[in-house]
Amino acid sequence: MKLRRAAVAAGLAVAAVAAHAQFVAVNEGFENVAGLPAAGWVLNNASTPIGTTGWFQAGPGFFDAFAGSQFSYIAANFNNAAAGGTIANFLFTPVFTTEGGSTVSFWARSIGEEGFVDHIRVGRTTGGTSAGDFIQIGGDITLTDTWTHYTFGIAKQPVGATGRAVIEYFGVADTSDFVGVDSLTVNVVPEPETWALFGLGLAALGFVKRRRKPA
């Protein structure tokens, strides 16, 4: 009886917490940009005309990372597009559930060299990885020469929905310079089924213990 009461109490506690709990679906420090595709990331440079670079691992000659080892951040620059071109370079996270809503946060900055300006915007997709799939959230961001923290939310989507978070580096190639993105996380509200299964597990535990009691 005591165990059953404990299981019921735990189940009620789970129900109370569920509405506010979030789990980390993506946690990327960009120590190894080359390994991102294998982890579900998509790097899509849709600049026109396309240039000689895309998203790449930072290296010597630029600013240090916000966190982690010295160059553990992902970078992009004016060479994403050819001279006179337009930059549209997309960074898509792995797919995660959007049913319960989610929060995406990261740090970003530019060099801040006089005469140049760097812009990014953030958004989501329903899973696609092309420029046409991009759904912008919030306004355009003009980066500064200081690591700055950005957070944006993805509203609750229909039952079973999944999607990706997106960062787009954009602008005129001739007046753009260099950007870095570091420490990106996606926190999601778990699907109701996750909590239901946990509650069933507690109930099953109480049932098994009750059946094991001696006659």
Set out the residue ranges of the language-model regions.
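Extracellular carbohydrate recognition and processing domains
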Residues: 129-159
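A short, hydrophobic C-terminal helix/tail in secreted or cell-surface proteins
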Residues: 191-208
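Sec/Tat signal peptide C-region and signal peptidase I cleavage site
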Residues: 17-21
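Short beta-strands within extracellular/lumenal beta-sheet-rich domains
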Residues: 82-100
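Extended, low-complexity, turn-rich repeat/linker tracts enriched in Gly/Pro/Ser/Thr and Asp/Glu
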Residues: 99-100, 109-117, 128, 173-175
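Extracellular glycan-recognition surfaces and repeat-rich motifs
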Residues: 23-24, 29-78
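Extracellular carbohydrate recognition
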Residues: 84-88, 171-187
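Bacterial N-terminal signal peptides that target proteins for export
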Residues: 1-8
